[in-house]
């Protein structure tokens, strides 16, 4: 970030704080609160703090744009591949899965992929929690968003950010008989740097209230292509253009206590294999990271990267639909051959 721009933002933030303090001492608390709660002011304050441009549109217009609607041909979830039975994985399924290592660990992938998964996700109480650490992440073409090659799409509007993607996953899972809690808390606003800490508290709250939860999905989208531009992914679901999916598993490499990280990796391998069986090329390599990203809270935790900033929302929704179908296929667990 350019130091001159950072200094200008800091100066503006100090000026706004001084004016706000002066107004507060003048006894106009309610008008000031209303002013600071305006979407355009919230967006500006986020820019001052992080340098990120966020769409100020937070209230739904009278008529929602067509892009917010899931593709009509995908409105009914496809039946899971093995309904009401455990899936069986073999060593040959490992050929469908790639792993991108950012750590020195080299676990036995065949053993993890073919290991039993003993659970039943179809219960009377919720068994899956969906959260969004970077809730304001959005996609190309969202209304009123400002885009630059070195920037990132962000939106406070739940019809365009990660909440919309989480809603599609939850909708398909619920239709398949799985009870879901979709927490729509915005964890990356106003403080982006506190995002994972905010999400951790949210997850802990739900696990305490619903100890039967055995899968926590932190749904994101990817951003950079590694050379300064916005990444665009390319996959297909039932012959239709879709965003690609990437599952991220954490480890204890960064020094945090996380003894069960291989269980989460095993789940990522299983889901990726199922996705590739149904729609070859839909997934990117499973990524093994050094940080735990709150995955230590339950063995069924994953980060799900649905497409990237350069993809369209409707492509992300189609990929989310396919991901939910793969979860449905694992609803009754997995057995060894």
Which residues are covered by each model-predicted region?
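N-terminal Lys/Arg-rich, disordered targeting/topogenic segments
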Residues: 1-5
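N-terminal catalytic or cofactor-binding beta/alpha core of small enzyme domains
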Residues: 10-214, 223-229, 321, 334
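Structural recognition of the beta-strand scaffold that forms the well-ordered cores
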Residues: 129-131, 180-182, 215-218, 246-249, ...
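Solvent-exposed loop/turn segments at secondary-structure junctions
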Residues: 135-138, 186-190, 221-226, 252-255, ...
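A short, glycine/acidic-enriched catalytic loop
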Residues: 148-152, 224-260
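Extracytoplasmic/secreted envelope proteins and their assembly/folding machinery
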Residues: 166-170, 200-204, 265-272, 301, ...
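Active-site-adjacent substrate-binding region
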Residues: 260-287
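Active-site-adjacent mobile loop/cap segments within catalytic or ligand-binding domains
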Residues: 281-337
């Amino acid at each position: 970030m350019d130091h001159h721009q950072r200094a200008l933002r800091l100066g503006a933030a100090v000026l706004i704080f001084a004016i706000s303090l002066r107004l507060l001492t003048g006894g106009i608390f309610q008008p000031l609160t209303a002013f600071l709660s305006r979407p355009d002011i919230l967006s500006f304050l986020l820019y001052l703090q992080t340098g990120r441009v966020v769409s100020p549109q937070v209230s739904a217009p009278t008529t929602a744009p067509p892009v917010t609607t899931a593709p009509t041909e995908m409105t009914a979830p496809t039946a899971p591949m093995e309904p009401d039975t455990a899936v069986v994985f073999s060593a040959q399924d490992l050929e469908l899965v790639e792993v991108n290592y950012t750590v020195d660990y080299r676990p036995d992938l065949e053993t993890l992929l073919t290991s039993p998964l003993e659970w039943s996700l179809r219960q009377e109480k919720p068994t899956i929690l969906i959260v969004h650490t970077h809730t304001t992440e959005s996609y190309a073409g969202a209304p009123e968003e400002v885009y630059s090659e070195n920037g990132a799409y962000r939106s406070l509007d739940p019809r365009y950010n990660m909440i919309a993607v989480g809603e599609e996953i939850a909708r398909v899972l619920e239709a398949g008989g799985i009870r879901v809690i979709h927490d729509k808390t915005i964890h990356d606003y106003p403080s982006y740097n506190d995002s994972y800490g905010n999400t951790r508290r949210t997850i802990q709250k739900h696990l305490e209230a619903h100890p039967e939860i055995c899968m926590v999905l932190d749904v994101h989208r990817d951003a950079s292509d590694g050379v300064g531009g916005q990444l665009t992914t390319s996959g297909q679901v039932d012959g239709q253009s879709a965003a690609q999916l990437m599952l991220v598993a954490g480890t204890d490499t960064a020094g945090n206590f996380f003894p069960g990280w291989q269980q989460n990796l095993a789940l990522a391998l299983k889901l990726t294999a199922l996705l590739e069986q149904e729609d070859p090329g839909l997934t990117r390599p499973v990524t093994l990271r050094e940080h735990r990203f709150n995955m230590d809270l339950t063995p069924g935790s994953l980060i799900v990267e649905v497409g990237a900033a350069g993809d369209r929302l409707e492509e992300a929704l189609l990929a989310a639909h396919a991901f939910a179908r793969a979860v449905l296929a694992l609803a009754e667990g997995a057995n060894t051959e």
